Amino acid sequence: MANVALIGATGMVGSHILTSLLENPAVARVDTISRRTPSAAAAAPQTQLTTFVSDDTSRWAAQLSSLTPTPSIFISAFGTTRAAAGGFENQYKVEHGLNVEMARAARDAGTKVYVLISSGGANKASSFAYPRMKGEIEEDVKALGFERTVILRPGLISGQRQESRPAEAAFRFIAGIAGKVHSGLKDGWAQDADVIARAAVNAGLKALDGDVPPGSEKLWILGGSDIIKYGGKK
């Protein structure tokens, strides 16, 4: 049975990850750390889910370090937007800084498996700021040396966000129409949030058991087709 810590539990993918974790019989306990109380917390028993809620993110790493038992898996679906952060410089400080800080705290606490929701375009050498930031997060957490690191690189994420992102919403609408015509028209470039979430949970549990593809013993990267494969309903 796995103990799992999760940040980003109130976001579009993270909320589905939390639901998937709570429904999975292989997960004994879930600890979330967030700015707001996750919606799933109201129905979950305290023996299964513990939430730590604080706007002061400087307290998050200490909270993660204090968890007992130590999480065997740490999942990050944490992210923010340029608009919410007040510009890209602040977005980078929050998203890159907190992701790496929390990953380091998990590693130091003895967590074995780290799972990151990244982006399909992540590339530390990109000339564009957002994919470069995502690539730098990947590189910095890989350097921490977890027993196993799992990185998911979804394309466009389909689903309903709480915050407004007009351009992205237009593409999500197109993805929804394409998916209704035939799933193959969408799966290569867009994945549903709940599918990404199940893939993250299933891949994390498989990594904990050592059940990973050959050559992925230390680092397992899942692209769009892998996310569809591991995120399908059984």
Swiss-Prot record:
It is a peripheral membrane protein. Keywords: Membrane, Mitochondrion, Mitochondrion outer membrane, Transit peptide. The keyword Transit peptide applies. Transmembrane segments: none annotated. InterPro entries: Epimerase_deHydtase (IPR001509), NAD(P)-bd_dom_sf (IPR036291). Pfam families: Epimerase (PF01370). One of its GO terms (cellular component) is mitochondrial outer membrane. The keyword Mitochondrion applies. GO terms for biological process: import into nucleus. It is found in: Mitochondrion outer membrane. Belongs to the FMP52 family. PANTHER family: OXIDOREDUCTASE HTATIP2. This is Protein fmp52-1, mitochondrial. It comes from Neosartorya fischeri (strain ATCC 1020 / DSM 3700 / CBS 544.65 / FGSC A1164 / JCM 1740 / NRRL 181 / WB 181) (Aspergillus fischerianus). The lineage of its organism: Eukaryota, Fungi, Dikarya, Ascomycota, Pezizomycotina.
